[in-house]
Amino acid sequence: MIRCHFARLLGEKKLKISDVSRDTGINRGTLTRLYYETSERYEVEVLNQLCRYFGCEIGTLLEYIEDVDGATG
C-alpha cells in the first residue's frame, strides 16, 4: 500500500490545508483526500507541486509499505 505523509508535513510546518490550497492552487478537496489518505489515485502534477512547495522529494511525501497479507493490487 502507498502511505501519504501529507498530514505529517502539514503538522511539522504548522500549516492548514487552506494555506497549501491558497499557495499552490491545488483544490482543497484534493488536499483533504491526501490528508485523510482517502485518495484512490495520485496525480503527478499535484505531487510535483507539493514536493516543490514543501521543498522535499517524493519519498518524503509518499511511502510504499508492503501489505501484511501479501495481497497485491
Protein language model features and the residues they cover:
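Phosphate-coordinating loops and pocket residues in cytosolic domains that bind phosphorylated ligands
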Residues: R22, Y36, E63
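Short, charged recognition helix plus adjacent turn
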Residues: R33, L62-G73
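A short, Lys/Arg-rich alpha-helix, primarily the initiator
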Residues: M1-S18, D23
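Short, solvent-exposed alpha-helical "recognition" segments
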Residues: T38-E43, G70-T72
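DNA major-groove recognition helix of helix-turn-helix/homeodomain DNA-binding modules
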Residues: E45-T60
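Recognition helix of helix-turn-helix/homeodomain-like DNA-binding domains
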Residues: I26-R41
